[in-house]
From Swiss-Prot:
Record function comment: Converts heme B (protoheme IX) to heme O by substitution of the vinyl group on carbon 2 of heme B porphyrin ring with a hydroxyethyl farnesyl side group.
Keyword Transmembrane helix in record: yes
Further remarks about this protein from its record: Carbon 2 of the heme B porphyrin ring is defined according to the Fischer nomenclature.
Membrane topology: Multi-pass membrane protein
Domain of life, source organism: Bacteria
Protein name: Protoheme IX farnesyltransferase
Swiss-Prot/TrEMBL keywords: Cell inner membrane, Cell membrane, Heme biosynthesis, Membrane, Transferase, Transmembrane, Transmembrane helix
GO biological process: heme O biosynthetic process
Length: 317
């Protein structure tokens, strides 16, 4: 590796080669970290729900392989993301100890790792299920790794809005793995995750604003300010609440899901309202250390998990 510095927006981030910053051999845990297992768990869950609510059936072994392919593809995208974002990861407090900026894994190794896993996951999905599921999986990898990571993330404060599509594909993939088609129901599941993503990540970005600003990432709080971000969180939560009840309103689900969607959405609206009404200084910065934003972020995780679980329960009761 050369001694040249990483540069982000013309600003020097580090003048030392990565291996000199923290020399050492990578552990198995480092290679797992590249796969972003926390993100993977939620993606695998929504993909599994997509399979469970789909009409028809898939052999349990093939179903397990399909879920594994979704997990591996998600991990591959995470590895490619960490390879590309190694410069900004090095200056953000919550990411500076990741394997690449910490010097435990070489960038080229991470990229190769991600590409091999990506290609392998798509090929195995094709062989185990069908071409539709494999094609959507391939596009999801491309969307996250290229469109979001390499283009949107550093170019627009709407990066999360558009890039949220990448995380919304798994239930569609799960459905397609069983049916070989894409119908209205998986599209609505896609829409739920798509509109859930902005309030989820903007809540995080409010209390991690300084990190994003230091790294030069144009997240909405950095570009438009905290006050505008709170307004956007509220607006997208309203949209999400409407979309979440659509499967019930259109008769595609029963009361279990419908009541769950209503109650959970009311809870999310309350959380977002608290974010909107958070005590602020004259420039819109929180006087409570963004406690409401932290609470909304945590609630959003519960919201999506329970909502999708209700879809599966509703299917079998």
């Amino acid at each position: 590796m050369s001694d040249s510095a990483f540069v982000n927006g013309g600003r020097e981030v580090s003048s030392l080669p990565l291996s000199a910053q923290m020399p050492g051999m990578a552990s198995a845990a480092d290679w797992v970290t590249l796969l972003k297992p926390r993100v993977m768990s939620l993606v695998v869950f929504t993909g599994l729900i997509g399979m469970l609510v789909a009409p028809g059936s898939l052999h349990p072994v093939l179903g397990a392989i399909a879920i594994l392919c979704i997990a591996v593809a998600t991990g591959a995208s995470g590895a490619i993301n960490m390879w590309y974002d190694r410069d900004i990861d090095a200056v953000m407090r919550r990411t500076k100890n990741r394997p690449i900026p910490a010097g435990r894994i070489e960038p080229g190794e991470a990229l190769g790792y991600g590409i091999v896993l990506a290609v392998g996951s798509v090929l195995v999905m094709w062989l185990a299920t069908n071409v539709v599921a494999a094609a959507v999986l391939a596009f999801a990898i491309f969307f996250y790794s290229v469109i979001y990571t390499m283009w949107l993330k550093r170019s627009t404060p709407q990066n999360i809005v558009i890039g949220g599509a990448a995380g919304a594909f798994p239930p569609v993939i799960g459905w397609a793995a069983v049916t070989g088609t894409i119908d209205l129901m998986p599209v609505m599941m896609f829409a739920i995750v798509f509109f859930w993503t902005p309030p989820h990540f903007w809540s995080l970005s409010l209390w991690a604003q300084m990190d994003y600003e230091r790294a030069g990432v144009p997240m909405l709080p950095v570009v438009a300010g905290a006050r505008k971000t709170r307004q956007h969180i509220m607006a997208y939560t309203v949209l999400l609440s409407v979309i979440a009840v659509l499967p019930w309103a259109l008769g595609d689900t029963g009361r279990v899901y419908g009541l769950s969607a209503v109650v959970l959405s009311l809870g999310f609206l309350v959380q977002s309202w608290r974010v909107l009404r958070d005590k602020q200084d004259e420039v819109g910065l929180s006087l409570t250390k963004d406690a409401p934003a932290r609470a909304a972020f945590k609630y959003s995780l519960i919201y999506l998990a329970v909502l999708f679980l209700a879809l599966a329960v509703d299917r079998f009761v």
